[in-house]
C-alpha cells in the first residue's frame, strides 16, 4: 500500500494525517502531526471474531508518552517507561469516552486502540492529536464504527473570547480548559475546568468547539474515502422478539413494581428474585434459550420499564420528581486527629473526606514530557467494594478512581488560595463509604467542607451535582441528582460543579445522538438550581473557612532574608541548615530570592527555627546592647560572640574605667557579659565596649 497523506487547517494549526507507511499490520494506523510540534502514532486492531464468553464490548484504549519524544531518558533504575502515569490514564479515558458509544449495539469483537506520542516540542498537549488519530484510524480500519469524531481544546479570556487549541502558555492565562469531542451532528463528550464561568459561557465553549472540529471530521472522511478498508460484513444478532414478549408478559408488571422499591438493597434483591424466576422458567431445558440470553432480555425489560416510566412523568425509582435532590446529611470535624474532615451523605451515597496539610517538601514530584514539576495539591478518590455491598479486589487505584479523583480536583482547584497566601501542600482523600450514584460529586462537596474545616482559606465553597437524561423519540426528561441505576439506564451523564457565582468543572458523556442545545441548556439550568440548594445546606454547617488551622496541622512561618545571607543560613555543605532542622525538629525551605518557609510540627518548633535563622542573618546594630559570650582572650582584649557567627572585639581599654593590666583579671573564656556595639567598619569588624554599657543603659538604650 502506498502512503496516503491528508493535510488540513485546524484553527491556527496545520494537521497532517498519514497512513500506509508505519504499522501496516494493524487493522488501521495513522500518524498525526500538528505543526511539527506533536507527532502521535495511533493504531487500531480489531478481532475478527467475538469471544462468546464475554458479555460486554471489550474495547481498550492505551495512550502512552515515550520520553524519547521530548529528547529525554527515563529516570529510575531500569531506564525505561513503566506503568502508565496519571496523565496517560486520564488521556486514555478521554479518548475512550467519545468513541465507545459509536460502536454498534451488539458488537462484541475485541478492539484495541494504542496512541503513542513519538515526538513533541512540549508546547501543546498531545491529547487532541491522539483523539484525531483515533478517529482517523477507526475510520480507515473497516471496523463497524458510526464515526468519525472530531475533538478540540478550548480556552477562554474575558477580553479575547474563545481560543481554539491553546498552547500550555496560553492555557496558563486562561479561565477555561475544556476538551470537547463529538460527531458532525452531536457532542458526545466534554471534560473541563473553569474559574467560575457562567453556564452560558460554558455552553458557548461547547458549541464553539463543535463548530471548529467539523474541519477534522471532513478531513478524516476524505482520508477514509481514499485509504479506507472495506467495512466488515458484520450484522447484529436478530432480536428474539418472541422471547422478549413472553418474558415481558409474564414479568413486566412485577419488574415495574420492583422499581418502586426505594431502598437500593431491597430493590436489587427483589429484581434478582424475578430474574432467577425468569431464567428458571424460560431456559434450562433442551431447545430453550440459554440462561445468558434470558438474563440479557430481562435486563432489556428493566431498561425499557425505567425509561418509559420517567418520560411519561411517573415518579423516579426512589419516588422523586425530576428536579429534587436527595436528602442531605452534612457533618464536619468528624475525625478528631485529622487536619480537616467531613462526612457528606446524599441519599444512599456517602463520602468521608479528609484534608491533610503538609510542607513544601510533601508536594508531589511529577516527571512529565515537559520536565519535572511539583504539584502542591492532590485529591485522591477511593471506591472500595463495600460501598456497594460487594466483595471485590482491594489494591491500587483503577482508571475509574483516577478519573473521578481528577474531576473532583478540577472542581475545587480554582477556589484554593494562591501559594504565596497559603504555602502548604494539600492532600484531600475521599473515601466512598456508600454509593448509589454520583459519588464523584459527593467527593466535591466533601472536599470543599473538609478544606474549610482544615482552615484552608477557600475563595468560595464548591458543590457538585450529577444530571441525567432519558430521551425516547421527541420526549425527554432531564434528571437532577441521578441514582446509579439512572446513570446506567440513561442517555447522558452530565456532572457540574461550581460556586454560587459560576461553574468550576463540567463533565459530560452522552450515549446517543440528538442531544440539542435546548437539552444542554435545561440540564445546566437544573444543575445550577440544585447546586445552589446544596451550597445553601453546606453553608448552614460551615459557611466559611475556619480562621485557625487545626492544632494537629504543621505550623508555617514565612520570612524573607537578604539574598547575600542565604549562604550563611545554609552553611558549608548545608551543615548550618541541617543542624537547625535536626535541633528544632522543623523543616526549612529557602528560595533563590531569599524567601524562607519554616514548617514545624508544633508552633514552638517553628518559632525556635525562626529565631535561629534570625540570629544568623541579623546584623550588629551600633548603639545596641547585646548579651554575649567570651570566645577568646588575647593580650589586647577579648573577642565576644554577640550573634551566631558574629564576634566583636572588646579592646583592653574598653573593659573598665579603671586601668586594666591583664584581660584575664576581668574576663574568662565562656563568661557571659553585656556589651555595647560602638562601631562596625566597612570590613564588617565589630568594635565593642563593656565599660560604656552602664552609661548607655542610663541614657535609655
Curated annotation (Swiss-Prot):
EC number in record: 2.7.7.8
Location relative to the cell: Cytoplasm
One term of GO molecular function: magnesium ion binding
Domain KH: 554-613
Keyword terms: Cytoplasm, Magnesium, Metal-binding, Nucleotidyltransferase, RNA-binding, Transferase
Principal cellular location given in the protein's record: cytoplasm
Span of domain S1 motif: 623-691
GO biological process, one term: mRNA catabolic process
Catalytic activity: RNA(n+1) + phosphate = RNA(n) + a ribonucleoside 5'-diphosphate
InterPro entries associated with the record: ExoRNase_PH_dom1, ExoRNase_PH_dom2, ExoRNase_PH_dom2_sf, KH_dom, KH_dom_type_1, KH_dom_type_1_sf, NA-bd_OB-fold, PNPase
UniProt key word Nucleotidyltransferase: yes
PROSITE patterns noted in UniProt: KH_TYPE_1, S1
Cofactor: Mg(2+)
Family matches, as SUPFAM superfamilies: Eukaryotic type KH-domain (KH-domain type I), Nucleic acid-binding proteins, Ribonuclease PH domain 2-like, Ribosomal protein S5 domain 2-like
UniProt-annotated binding residues for Mg(2+): 487, 493
Database matches in CDD domains: KH-I_PNPase (cd02393), RNase_PH_PNPase_1 (cd11363), RNase_PH_PNPase_2 (cd11364), S1_PNPase (cd04472)
An annotated GO cellular component: cytosol
Family per similarity comment: Belongs to the polyribonucleotide nucleotidyltransferase family.
Assembly mode: Component of the RNA degradosome, which is a multiprotein complex involved in RNA processing and mRNA degradation.
NCBIfam families assigned to the protein according to its UniProt record, in alphabetical order: polynuc_phos, PRK11824.1
Cited function: Involved in mRNA degradation. Catalyzes the phosphorolysis of single-stranded polyribonucleotides processively in the 3'- to 5'-direction.
Name of this protein: Polyribonucleotide nucleotidyltransferase
Gene label: pnp
Amino acid at each position: 500500500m502506498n502512503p496516503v497523506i491528508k493535510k488540513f487547517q485546524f484553527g491556527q494549526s496545520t494537521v497532517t494525517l498519514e497512513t500506509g507507511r508505519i504499522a501496516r499490520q494493524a487493522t488501521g494506523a495513522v500518524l498525526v502531526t500538528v505543526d511539527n510540534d506533536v507527532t502521535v502514532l495511533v493504531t487500531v486492531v480489531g478481532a475478527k471474531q467475538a469471544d462468546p464468553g464475554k458479555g460486554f464490548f471489550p474495547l481498550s484504549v492505551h495512550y502512552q508518552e515515550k520520553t524519547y519524544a521530548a529528547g529525554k531518558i527515563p529516570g529510575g533504575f531500569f531506564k525505561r517507561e513503566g506503568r502508565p502515569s496519571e496523565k496517560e490514564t486520564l488521556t486514555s479515558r478521554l479518548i475512550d469516552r467519545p468513541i465507545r458509544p459509536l460502536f454498534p449495539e451488539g458488537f462484541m469483537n475485541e478492539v484495541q486502540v494504542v496512541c503513542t506520542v513519538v515526538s513533541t516540542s512540549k508546547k501543546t498537549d498531545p491529547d487532541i492529536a491522539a483523539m484525531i488519530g483515533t478517529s482517523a484510524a477507526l475510520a480507515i480500519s473497516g471496523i463497524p464504527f458510526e464515526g468519525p469524531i472530531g475533538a478540540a481544546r478550548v480556552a477562554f479570556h474575558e477580553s479575547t473570547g474563545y481560543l481554539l487549541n491553546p498552547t500550555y502558555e496560553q492555557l496558563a492565562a486562561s479561565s477555561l480548559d475544556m476538551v470537547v469531542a463529538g460527531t458532525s451532528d452531536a457532542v458526545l463528550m466534554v471534560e473541563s475546568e473553569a474559574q467560575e464561568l457562567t453556564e452560558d459561557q460554558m455552553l458557548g465553549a461547547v458549541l464553539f468547539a463543535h463548530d471548529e472540529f467539523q474541519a477534522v471530521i471532513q478531513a478524516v472522511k476524505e482520508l477514509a474515502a481514499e485509504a479506507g478498508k472495506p467495512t466488515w460484513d458484520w450484522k447484529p444478532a436478530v432480536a428474539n422478539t418472541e422471547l422478549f414478549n413472553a418474558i415481558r408478559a409474564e414479568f413486566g408488571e412485577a419488574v415495574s413494581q420492583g422499581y418502586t422499591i426505594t431502598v437500593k438493597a431491597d430493590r436489587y434483591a427483589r429484581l434478582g428474585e424475578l430474574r432467577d424466576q425468569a431464567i428458571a422458567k424460560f431456559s434450562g431445558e433442551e431447545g430453550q434459550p440459554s440462561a445468558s440470553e434470558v438474563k440479557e432480555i430481562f435486563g432489556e425489560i428493566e431498561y425499557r420499564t425505567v425509561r418509559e416510566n420517567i418520560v411519561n412523568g411517573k415518579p423516579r425509582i426512589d419516588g422523586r420528581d425530576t428536579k429534587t435532590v436527595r436528602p442531605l446529611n452534612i457533618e464536619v470535624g468528624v475525625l478528631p486527629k485529622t487536619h480537616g474532615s467531613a462526612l457528606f451523605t446524599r441519599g444512599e451515597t456517602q463520602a468521608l473526606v479528609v484534608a491533610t496539610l503538609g510542607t513544601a517538601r510533601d508536594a508531589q514530584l511529577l516527571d512529565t514530557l515537559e520536565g519535572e514539576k511539583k504539584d502542591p495539591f492532590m485529591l485522591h478518590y477511593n471506591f472500595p467494594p463495600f460501598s456497594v455491598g460487594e466483595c471485590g479486589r482491594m489494591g491500587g487505584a483503577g482508571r475509574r478512581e483516577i478519573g473521578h479523583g481528577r474531576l473532583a480536583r478540577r472542581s475545587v482547584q480554582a477556589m484554593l488560595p494562591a501559594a504565596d497566601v497559603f504555602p502548604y501542600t494539600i492532600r484531600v482523600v475521599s473515601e466512598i463509604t456508600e454509593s448509589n450514584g454520583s459519588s464523584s460529586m459527593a467527593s466535591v462537596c466533601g472536599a470543599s467542607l473538609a478544606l474549610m474545616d482544615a482552615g484552608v482559606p477557600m475563595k468560595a465553597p464548591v458543590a457538585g451535582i450529577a444530571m441525567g437524561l432519558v430521551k425516547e423519540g421527541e420526549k425527554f426528561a432531564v434528571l437532577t441528582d441521578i441514582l446509579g441505576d439512572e446513570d446506567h439506564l440513561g442517555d447522558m451523564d452530565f456532572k457540574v460543579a461550581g460556586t454560587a457565582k459560576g461553574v468550576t468543572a463540567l463533565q459530560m458523556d452522552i450515549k446517543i445522538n440528538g442531544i440539542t442545545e435546548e437539552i444542554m441548556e435545561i440540564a445546566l439550568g437544573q444543575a445550577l438550581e440544585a447546586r445552589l440548594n446544596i451550597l445553601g445546606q453546606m453553608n448552614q454547617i460551615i459557611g466559611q473557612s475556619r480562621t485557625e488551622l487545626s492544632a494537629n496541622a504543621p505550623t508555617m512561618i514565612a520570612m524573607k532574608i537578604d539574598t547575600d545571607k542565604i549562604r550563611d543560613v545554609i552553611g558549608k555543605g548545608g551543615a548550618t541548615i541541617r543542624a537547625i532542622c535536626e535541633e528544632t525538629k522543623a523543616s526549612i525551605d529557602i528560595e533563590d530570592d531569599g524567601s524562607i518557609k519554616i514548617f514545624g510540627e508544633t508552633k514552638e518548633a517553628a518559632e525556635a527555627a525562626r529565631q535561629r535563622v534570625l540570629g544568623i542573618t541579623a546584623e550588629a546594630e551600633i548603639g545596641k546592647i547585646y548579651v554575649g559570650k567570651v570566645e577568646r582572650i588575647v593580650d589586647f582584649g577579648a573577642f565576644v560572640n554577640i550573634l551566631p557567627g558574629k564576634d566583636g572585639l572588646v579592646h583592653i581599654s574598653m573593659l573598665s574605667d579603671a586601668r586594666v593590666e591583664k584581660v584575664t583579671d576581668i574576663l574568662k573564656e565562656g563568661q557571659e557579659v553585656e556589651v555595647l556595639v560602638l562601631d562596625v567598619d566597612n570590613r564588617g569588624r565589630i568594635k565593642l565596649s563593656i565599660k560604656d554599657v552602664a552609661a548607655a543603659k542610663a541614657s535609655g538604650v
